[in-house]
Amino acid sequence: PYTQNTFRENWIDDGNWACDNNSFTERSQRFFGNAFLKYSTKFGTDNHKLDVKYQIGDDAYTTNYSDIYGYGTTGYANGYASEYGFTVNEMNSLLTFTYNWNINEDFVFDALLGNELVDKRISNTQAVGYSFNFPGWNHLNNASVFNSSHEYKRKRTVGNFASLSLA
């Protein structure tokens, strides 16, 4: 079972053999959601109004991959396994203050003040193994040569904004 009859070029696995000995999987999990709070007041008058609004949202997901080339595959005669994945978490926060003042029939003052924060975190993990020790156990733990790596990145963006108008 660890040798194959191939009628194509020597770098292409036989289709039936590959189905029995090679595997490729992808698994993903995801969560996302948002919420907001809003407060409004007219200060007991008809010509002033203040709105304060806070919004927060999150998008978090993990995807893991596994690529297995079984013992006897044409590209890696003694087998090859790769498991890699990434996790991403992106949080967004927005706070705004909106003020409106009707000074008189001719003038209206509007003000907007805000702050936005976007925080993104990415984690990558990879493990690769070559040359399986035993045929029939196509798994990363069976590799005689093993390499792994991990990378973590974080990016934070902050923005402040304001607008004033008198019309």
Segments from the language model and where they lie:
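Short loop/turn motifs that connect adjacent beta-strands in outer-membrane beta-barrel proteins
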Residues: 42-50, 102-109
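Acidic/polar loop-and-plug regions of large Gram-negative outer-membrane beta-barrel proteins
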Residues: 1-32, 155
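Structural signature of outer-membrane beta-barrel domains
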Residues: 55-65, 116-123
